[in-house]
A protein has these predicted regions:
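Conserved short histidine dyad/triad with adjacent acidic residue
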Residues: 21, 36-50
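A cytosolic small-molecule/anion-sensing beta-strand core signal
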Residues: 60-61, 76-77, 95
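Short acidic-glycine-tyrosine-enriched beta hairpin
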Residues: 70-85
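Structural motif
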Residues: 34, 56, 63-65, 72, ...
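Short, conserved beta-strand element in jelly-roll/cupin
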Residues: 39-41, 51-66
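Ligand-binding loop in jelly-roll beta-barrel domains
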Residues: 85-109
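A short, N-terminal "cap"/entry segment at the start of jelly-roll beta-barrel domains
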Residues: 1-32, 36, 115-116
Length: 116
């Protein structure tokens, strides 16, 4: 590959980061976005929060109950939820759940290890 910023990432070579006892993740970051694999055990709760990134959450396995801007939304396997920049949201795993998340701009707080 050329030296034009092209980079191949292999998920199996990226360390799994334990966020809590119930949530873990792996992520890669480009210039403008972060791509994350997130694993949530059934019953896991990510408290209400907001961030400077637009978020797309694609549920590959399991299901999530999300409270987004006061609205209760269930996101199931095969579904994608878009959360605009700055919108408060909370997550609860209804099952053992595996999601792919895309964030833009990048999650600098994750890189700096200062945010969930």
């Amino acid at each position: 590959m050329s030296d034009a910023g092209v980079r191949l990432h292999r998920w199996d070579e990226i360390a799994l980061e334990k966020v809590t006892e119930m949530v873990s993740r792996k992520f890669v970051t480009g210039d403008r976005e972060t791509l994350a694999q997130v694993y949530l055990k059934r019953g896991a709760v990510v408290p209400r929060h907001a961030h400077a990134s637009e978020q797309m959450t694609y549920v590959l396995q399991g299901a999530l109950r999300m409270l987004v801007d006061g609205e209760d939304v269930t996101v199931r396997e095969g579904e994608v939820l878009r959360i605009p920049t700055g919108v408060a949201h909370q997550v609860e795993a209804l099952d053992d759940t595996f999601v792919l998340g895309v964030f833009s701009p990048i999650r600098q707080d994750w890189i700096d290890r200062t945010g969930e």
